[in-house]
UniProtKB/Swiss-Prot annotation:
Species name: Vibrio cholerae serotype O1 (strain ATCC 39315 / El Tor Inaba N16961)
Binding residues for FMN: 106, 127, 155, 251, 306-330
Gene3D superfamilies registered for this protein in UniProt: Aldolase class I
Membrane topology listed for this record: Peripheral membrane protein
Cofactor (UniProt): FMN
UniProt-annotated location(s): Cell inner membrane
UniProt cross-references to PROSITE patterns, sorted A to Z: FMN_HYDROXY_ACID_DH_1, FMN_HYDROXY_ACID_DH_2
Domain FMN hydroxy acid dehydrogenase: 1-378
InterPro entries (alphabetical): Aldolase_TIM, Alpha-hydoxy_acid_DH_FMN, FMN-dep_DH, FMN_HAD, FMN_hydac_DH_AS, LldD
GO MF annotations, alphabetized: FMN binding; L-lactate dehydrogenase activity
Record's protein name: L-lactate dehydrogenase
UniProt cross-references to HAMAP family, sorted A to Z: L_lact_dehydr
Gene name in the database record: lldD
Record's keyword terms, sorted: Cell inner membrane, Cell membrane, Flavoprotein, FMN, Membrane, Oxidoreductase
Amino acid sequence: MIISASTDYRAAAKAKLPPFLFHYIDGGSYGEHTLRRNTDDLADIALRQRVLSDMSELSLETELFGEKMALPIALSPVGLTGMYARRGEVQAAQAAEAKGIPFTLSTVSVCPIEEVAPSIHRPIWFQLYVLKDRGFMKNVLERAKAAGVKNLVFTVDMPVPGARYRDMHSGMSGPNAAMRRVLQAMAHPSWAWDVGLLGKPHDLGNISKYRGSPTKLEDYIGWLGANFDPSISWKDLEWIRDFWDGPMIIKGILDTEDAKDAVRFGADGIVVSNHGGRQLDGVLSTVQALPAIADAVKGDLKILVDSGIRTGLDVVRMLALGADCTMLGRSFIYALAAQGRAGVENLLDLYEKEMRVAMTLTGAKSIAELSRDSLVKR
């Protein structure tokens, strides 16, 4: 398959992956309306073309939480990344480091912190949920500190798991799920050999380290459902703020009042996110939510944004609307599944090229020069 655009990786991943894995990353919650709006609403944002601006000196570099970045992009935390490529979290982290951007490790990764962090020189970011088992939370935070993690991404939009109907149909969950997954793996021998056999162990590495026994894929859905805490409030985050002395980023903000609460709480950053359309269907797309949030808290903390970002043009749109940085989830997983580390590096090259074209033709010589003046007002 010829890869000429960042969006080509989705089809490449679909061809290579067993359906239960492809649809797990590709799908959203309920009717997937928000999933579609994330991309459709972004595509509807018109860029304002400007010419004859001498764009010979153009820079995509930025700085976030004292960390220099070659691109205003970070790789998002994605659960089970190690099921999409052999030791997938390690490969993705190495690709991110090679391109000069951060990688964020998920709580529910296959590869544990102790495997991923030493695989690169750049400090990884770590993502954590609020869970009922506070002992696990303290344990994993201590391990993250010991591994040199500086930035903590705290996900707050999963007090309960979203209803993801595709997972029932694809074999990730539902009747006879284990047998269906085995049959699907047999029909995809390349994945079965490279990841299914050579990529073992397939457990939730961060959780297994704490429990002292493997937490297998079969236990994944049940563990999530049993440990997410619907009683979560800002007060529950206070002990983590006291315990964690590095930058703390609150992920899952869609409302201006929540953004203001994050400022009052003392967060260093927020991620404007609807979890890629995987939690509450029918909420705003992130590109719809971002402008009001930027108007409310820009300058008080750093604003990151994810969900629906599929091209370098989308990155430019989000930055013009007030984001300081973007985060990629699905798109890097598609590339990782298709071509491993090399695929993620190539994906980021494509994003960079697309950004350079967009910024050259909108007259923005740097990330700081992108603003709503870079967009067509409608």
